[in-house]
Amino acid sequence: MLTTPGIDARNGEYEAFGVPATILANFLRENGVVPEKCDLNSILFLLTPAEDMAKLQQLVALLVRFEKLLESDAPLAEVLPSIYKQHEERYAGYTLRQLCQEMHDLYARHNVKQLQKEMFRKEHFPRVSMNPQEANYAYLRGEVELVRLPDAEGRIAAEGALPYLPGVLCVVPGEIWGGAVLRYFSALEEGINLLPGFAPELQGVYIEEHDGRKQVWCYVIKPRDAQSTLLKGEKL
């Protein structure tokens, strides 16, 4: 595993400039090397017995090349040609450091690393309002409604929601949307709009475009149906 600049190892605080690992990961993919996964500022490679010295040398050479491109602040069209071509209007004239700075600032503004920690600490877990099975049955019966992410706060999730990374369910059916989970998905929504081409994989939520902006939507239990299910102690 390698770490990229951006977080002070002494105190865990964001530095003024950083290199989000997803940018390095995309550069490596552009050049035939596929990392196993990457997080905010770390990237993981899996080595198998089949790997030979030539492949390791290729990886090292690409890392050195990326570092030189970063130092020279190379044009983004040279570093990530595929993403640049797909979103040329958005990234016209951009350099590598400029992209790194914008993405790093987004992470720092939302304190995304702290949100990731809180989502998996017991004291920050979403409050449970329904049995997951009951919530799933309500979903299958259509006793749900699709709402925008900001409107989901305080509502009961009808589906489990999973962002990759970290690739773990952050809210499960029957839990209340809110807290660190809602703020984390809100940060992802901003990133999807601000930095096209770097959208994370999301499951259990839905991306819809309205007036030129992509919005995150999710299914929640209809209030009266949820109350009825709880009061009756319905078993299916």
Spans of model-derived segments:
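Non-catalytic terminal extensions of PLP-dependent enzymes
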Residues: 1-236
